[in-house]
Amino acid sequence: MTDHVPINPCTIPQFTGDLDALEQDKNAITAAAGTFRDAGSNVDSEFQGLSAFYSAPEAAQLFATTKPVKTDSDFFADQLESAATALGEYITEARPIVARLKELQAKATAFSGKISGDAHWKDDGDKIDENNDLIHDVNAAVSAFWAAERTCANKIRALYCAPPLTADDGSHGANMYGYKGEDLNKAQDLPWGSQLEETHRAWEIGYWVKSFV
């Protein structure tokens, strides 16, 4: 039988990466894109400059050979810039979610302190509501973070024609990652705690009478 437990601040997911470092990497990718673009353009333009000093029947064909260098460099630079843009949008979207998860962990810690040592806290409907509201808030934040990850990954995956990631619908199929908030809300027990119901003890006559009316 599953042991339903209140929200546990220690198991609320927290971002363990470094968004500032990721932003630096994003900027480096953008700079690299410019370097590739300029290098390809320079190879072509400098080679074309030799046309003033070379004249032969095959000259046109010869000087056309560097056009693909410029074209391919532009294409690769475009790919890098698209990836950098996806990362930048992810960073912007992730920052408030990361802060929200920290805030919820602090709230859950305070709630845990409030019910600590109280064997009958589940008799208090307000505390049950507070627990369940915290669970729902964590569900919303975690699912929003998964969605941000999927969105970023899918923009990058599209660059090399990989299939998009989708939210797991419970079937755990290929290319599924994370869950939607509404689906998490349907689960009673989650890694960060359980949705609970108020308990009623034998002497709460009013409750038991109403339950049979």
For the regions a language model picked out, list residue spans one by one.
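N-terminal secretion-targeting helices of virulence/extracellular proteins
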Residues: M1-Y179, A187, E204
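Hydrophobic, gly/ala-rich membrane-insertion helices/peptides used by toxins and envelope proteins
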Residues: N185-V213
